[in-house]
From Swiss-Prot:
This is Orotidine 5'-phosphate decarboxylase. SUPFAM superfamilies: Ribulose-phoshate binding barrel. NCBIfam families: PRK00230.1, pyrF. GO terms for molecular function: orotidine-5'-phosphate decarboxylase activity. CDD domains: OMP_decarboxylase_like. Pathway: Pyrimidine metabolism; UMP biosynthesis via de novo pathway; UMP from orotate: step 2/2. GO terms for cellular component: cytosol. Pfam families: OMPdecase. Keywords: Decarboxylase, Lyase, Pyrimidine biosynthesis.
């Protein structure tokens, strides 16, 4: 069963934790669906709050995806991934275009961090293929986003990563080429029209509904504004429940 990841894209830790507390009411539903409700900490929130926000979310019982998309020289990325694991994060990511040496160094950093942590399940390391904000025709040289994502995913598999970040449009092809156990985490998830909130599809371009992404083979679905922007104190939990129900019905 695919699992739901809530993107806590906030400028402050207080705002992120308030939403996380509001989402506690959806965790029973997630458990009934056979999965867990994850929290995603991205660049804005982590830069503002540091490792404390990961620790606070873990204390609330949520698994955490630390979405920092490392892309630097191999030794720097190795240390960054090792430090990401030390925060207690259950999943982190790097940019696959950083190349083979960088990606293999990241895998080494993951193993070192897991050994130092010494408890719990080994964290998941994902490679970012093509951002879901990229539309066809926007890549250099006119490269096709889906073809480029598939090419990078095959490289990531060879270099030792556990999966990739990709749009739902690429998930089925990546599973065929890399195996069913190769994880596909999919951002750009937007609920069916009656549940949408905010202005259109915002900055996302290659979007799918939760049911479409599950049917395509995505293992983790990332949803932000349709949940975090839901009105009322019970709005985020209700929005998450509806998305989980759509995922179960796929």
């Amino acid at each position: 069963m695919a699992e739901l990841v809530i993107a806590l894209d906030y400028p402050t830790m207080d705002a992120a934790l308030a939403t996380a507390r509001a989402l506690r009411g959806a965790t029973d539903t997630a458990g009934d669906a056979g999965g867990r409700l994850w929290m995603k900490v991205g660049l804005e929130l982590f830069t503002a709050s540091g490792p404390e926000v990961v620790a606070r979310l873990k204390d609330m019982g949520f698994p955490v995806f630390l979405d920092l998309k490392f892309h630097d020289i191999p030794n720097t990325v190795r240390g960054a991934v090792r430090s990401a694991v030390a925060t207690g994060a259950d999943m982190c990511n790097i940019h696959l275009p950083g190349g083979e040496r960088m990606c293999r160094a990241a895998v080494e950093g993951l193993a070192e961090g897991a050994a130092a942590r010494g408890h719990g399940a080994a964290p998941i390391l994902l490679g970012v293929t093509v951002l879901t904000s990229v539309a066809p025709g926007e890549l250099p040289g006119g490269a096709d986003p889906s073809a480029e994502a598939a090419r990078l995913a095959v490289c990531g598999r060879e270099w030792g990563l556990g999966g990739v970040v990709c749009s739902g449009y690429e998930a089925a092809g990546i599973k065929q080429r890399c195996g069913r156990d190769f994880i596909c985490l999919t951002p750009g998830i937007r609920p069916a029209a009656p549940q949408r909130s905010g202005s259109g599809d915002d900055d996302q371009r290659r979007v799918m509904t939760p049911a479409e992404a599950v049917r395509a083979g995505s293992d983790y679905l990332v949803v932000g504004r349709p949940v975090t922007g839901a009105a009322g104190p019970d709005g985020p939990a209700e929005a998450a429940r509806r998305i989980l129900a759509e995922m179960r019905g796929a």
